[in-house]
């Protein structure tokens, strides 16, 4: 499969991209999570979709192979929306499908609602977070299912502002192995991409852990605007996902042309936990969207 890589100038620096495949079908652009993670885990699964269309992966500014500026004012949703527009323009992506995962769904929603771009044929919200407050409420409920001592550790360190302690990190792992990735051992592509992630971006925009939003995304809520998304839409999540099936179904109910799929043996990274089914569901949705 043909692959093209390069850099694109965006507000704040250069971002690295990889274009896989050259089929005639509409390109798919993939927005990774974090904020501050990398494209690698998603590409390890979704590159196979390049057999009949170009699939574009990129590392958002600050992470992976992209420039890592230290200016904290760059880490805001509006700039990431501009970045996505720049990438589409640079690669001449007049028509696209978009797949966003986790934070990538926040970016996708902001892009669709605020930038009102032309040429987006469909949108896939993978393990979505479209209301930070709702995410926090879900996380609080999931934490209540952890061992009592783990719950107490989380509460104590968040109250005392000592979330960088080893105790808090260990408690985080208990939550993550239930609701982020249930595979044991953790897939190599996840462990190897960690050093390329950017904790500063994550802390500035989100917070010290998945269940403690304290950054500038803590007030993020696009649920009132979801009805404006009037293109074929797919919402997917795992049965044990921190992006819970209940909340994912709620978001789906607010979007006019939306469907829902739950991966029964997955948490937050269904694309790694149930790879074959994930690819099958995405492929089927894209074909359906293109047949309309």
Curated annotation (Swiss-Prot):
Pfam families: Abhydrolase_1 (PF00561). SUPFAM superfamilies: alpha/beta-Hydrolases. Its EC number is 3.4.11.5. Residues 27-274 form the AB hydrolase-1 domain. GO terms for biological process: proteolysis. Keywords: Aminopeptidase, Hydrolase, Protease. One of its GO terms (cellular component) is membrane. GO terms for molecular function: aminopeptidase activity. InterPro entries: AB_hydrolase_1 (IPR000073), AB_hydrolase_fold (IPR029058), AB_hydrolase_sf (IPR050266), Peptidase_S33 (IPR002410), Pro_imino_pep (IPR005945). The active site is at residues 102, 241, 268. It catalyses: Release of N-terminal proline from a peptide. Belongs to the peptidase S33 family. Releases the N-terminal proline from various substrates. This is Proline iminopeptidase. The gene is pip.
């Amino acid at each position: 499969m043909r692959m093209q890589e390069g850099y694109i100038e965006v507000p704040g620096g250069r971002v690295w991209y990889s274009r896989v495949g050259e089929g005639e079908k509409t390109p798919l652009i993939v927005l990774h999570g974090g904020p501050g993670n990398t494209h690698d885990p998603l590409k390890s699964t979704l590159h196979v979709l390049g057999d009949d269309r170009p699939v574009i992966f990129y590392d958002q500014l600050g992470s992976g192979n992209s420039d890592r500026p230290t200016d904290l004012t760059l880490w805001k949703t509006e700039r990431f929306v501009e970045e996505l527009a720049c990438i589409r323009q640079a690669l001449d992506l007049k028509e696209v499908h978009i797949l966003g995962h986790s934070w990538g769904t926040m970016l996708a929603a902001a892009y669709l609602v605020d930038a009102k771009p032309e040429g987006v044929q469909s949108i896939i919200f993978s393990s979505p977070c479209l209301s930070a407050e709702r995410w926090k409420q879900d996380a609080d409920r999931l934490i209540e299912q952890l061992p009592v001592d783990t719950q107490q550790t989380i509460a104590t360190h968040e109250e005392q502002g000592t979330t960088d302690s080893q105790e808090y990190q260990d408690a985080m792992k208990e939550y993550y192995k239930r609701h982020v990735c249930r595979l044991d051992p953790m897939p190599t592509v996840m462990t190897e991409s960690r050093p390329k992630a950017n904790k500063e971006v994550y802390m500035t925009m989100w917070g010290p852990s998945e269940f403690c939003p304290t950054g500038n995304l803590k007030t993020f809520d696009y649920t009132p605007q979801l009805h404006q998304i009037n293109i074929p839409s797919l919402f997917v999540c795992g049965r044990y996902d921190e992006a819970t099936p209940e909340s994912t179904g709620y978001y789906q109910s607010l979007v006019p042309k939306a469907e829902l799929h739950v991966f029964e043996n997955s948490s937050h990274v269904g694309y790694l936990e149930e790879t074959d089914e994930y690819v099958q569901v995405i492929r089927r949705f894209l074909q359906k969207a293109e047949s309309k």
